[in-house]
């Protein structure tokens, strides 16, 4: 027990302080008895003379009692004065990583290109024209017509090319030529329709102009006749008055 309470130097220091404060024994002395919770406390401080009516003695006694009051189940008194060193671990600084905004992936719209056929070109208003170069005319272009779809225009080119070059012709649809398929139907071009509409409008406007001029001439002749009649009547009246 005494080996476990290896704090004699601390006890001696406290004892010297207590004796200095008390200054000797008196009549009313308070001695620590066996009821002290620690046997080490009893063995070391049981012989100290403390006066009950002295406030300083009571203060020292209270301090000593509080200092050595611990759990009786513990046999190691070194916990009162010998605290284990606390290892201070460095705190890790967690820096919040800034999330970079995700770059918007540009949606690349793959433009679907229309298939290009030999001898076919698209008109500005959406129709498809077919033409071919005639080797007999020094490569001059021969107009084959305008069609609703590019396939019809390509078929018209194939028919004309096969007629000009025979089996040596480069065709868009080799299997469709001479297969009994009917020829593609041409459509009237925009220019022809516009010219026909303009000619019809011009003829109608010219007819309207002729009709207006005819009506004006009729009105003028009627007015002239009326004036002549009035003049004739006035001359007759004058002759009658003179006579």
Curated annotation (Swiss-Prot):
Ranges for region Disordered: 181-219
Induction context: Induced by jasmonate (JA) and Alternaria brassicicola (locally and systemically). Ethylene induction is completely dependent on a functional ETHYLENE-INSENSITIVE2 (EIN2) while wounding induction does not require EIN2. Transcripts accumulate strongly in cycloheximide-treated plants, a protein synthesis inhibitor. Seems to not be influenced by exogenous abscisic acid (ABA), cold, heat, NaCl or drought stress.
Superkingdom per UniProt: Eukaryota
InterPro entries documented for this protein: AP2/ERF_dom, AP2/ERF_dom_sf, DNA-bd_dom_sf, ERF_plant
Any one GO BP annotation for this protein: positive regulation of DNA-templated transcription
Entry-linked SMART domains: AP2
DNA-binding residues (ranges): 116-174
Keywords, sorted A to Z: Activator, DNA-binding, Ethylene signaling pathway, Nucleus, Plant defense, Transcription, Transcription regulation
Signal peptide: none
Composition-biased stretches (Low complexity): 192-206
Matching CDD domains: AP2
Single GO term (MF): DNA-binding transcription factor activity
UniProt family annotation: Belongs to the AP2/ERF transcription factor family. ERF subfamily.
Function in brief: Acts as a transcriptional activator. Binds to the GCC-box pathogenesis-related promoter element. Involved in the regulation of gene expression by stress factors and by components of stress signal transduction pathways. Involved in disease resistance pathways.
Free-text domain note: The AP2/ERF domain binds specifically to the 5'-GCCGCC-3' motif. The affinity of this binding is higher if the seventh amino-acid of this domain is basic.
Protein name as catalogued: Ethylene-responsive transcription factor 2
Species whose genome carries this gene: Arabidopsis thaliana
Name of the encoding gene: ERF2
């Amino acid at each position: 027990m005494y080996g476990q309470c290896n704090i004699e130097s601390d006890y001696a220091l406290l004892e010297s302080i207590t004796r200095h404060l008390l200054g000797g024994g008196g009549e009313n002395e308070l001695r620590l008895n066996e009821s002290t919770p620690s046997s080490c406390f009893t063995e070391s401080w049981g012989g100290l003379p403390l006066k009950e009516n002295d406030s300083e003695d009571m203060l020292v006694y209270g301090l000593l009692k509080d200092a050595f009051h611990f759990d009786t189940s513990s046999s190691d008194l070194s916990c009162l004065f010998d605290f284990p060193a606390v290892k201070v671990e460095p705190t890790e600084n967690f820096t919040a990583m800034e999330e970079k905004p995700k770059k918007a992936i540009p949606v690349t719209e793959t433009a679907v290109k229309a298939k290009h056929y030999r001898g076919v070109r698209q008109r500005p208003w959406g129709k498809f024209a077919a033409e071919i170069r005639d080797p007999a005319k020094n490569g001059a272009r021969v107009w084959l017509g305008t069609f609703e779809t590019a396939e019809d225009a390509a078929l018209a080119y194939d028919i004309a090319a096969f007629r000009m070059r025979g089996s040596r012709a480069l065709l868009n649809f080799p299997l469709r030529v001479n297969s009994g398929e009917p020829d593609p139907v041409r459509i009237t071009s925009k220019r022809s329709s516009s010219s026909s509409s303009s000619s019809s409008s011009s003829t109608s406007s010219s007819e309207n102009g002729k009709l207006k001029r005819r009506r004006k001439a009729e009105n003028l002749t009627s007015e002239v006749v009326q004036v002549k009649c009035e003049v004739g009547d006035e001359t007759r009246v004058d002759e009658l008055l003179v006579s």
